Amino acid sequence: MKVFFIDLHSPWSRTNEHEWYYCLGPDNPDRPELDARWRRFREELSSATAGGPLVYDPKWDIPGGVGYNQSERMGTSSCAWFNRLPNGWCAFCIEYGYGLCGGVFTRERGRDLGRRCMRATVRSLLHDPSVDDDVW
């Protein structure tokens, strides 16, 4: 069985990046397949949020090893740790900004975004041949 992990939260520090919501990519150079899975999820998330109250735009994403998204710089994140597990399919972080995130961030809009995020997660898992059909 494969396990998927998403860390959802507001960032621990405020920088210019934190005016939008975005994904932090995996920082595990020993597992190149994670980048393809992260890319697929981002495509699905972009599609799932299109037309919603809070639209995800991958241009704000920070790949692993870039900017503050470096294990050497911030220590081992929960996602980097999870990606070392043998049954870990993929883990990454979605940061919710301190700004408007492309629209007014309300409780209802946050819930809508969460539902759309889960839709993208399921679609990502369904398109990966390494995931067994019997887990559904």
Each language-model region and where it sits:
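Structured catalytic-domain cores with a bias toward divalent-metal coordination
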Residues: 1-136
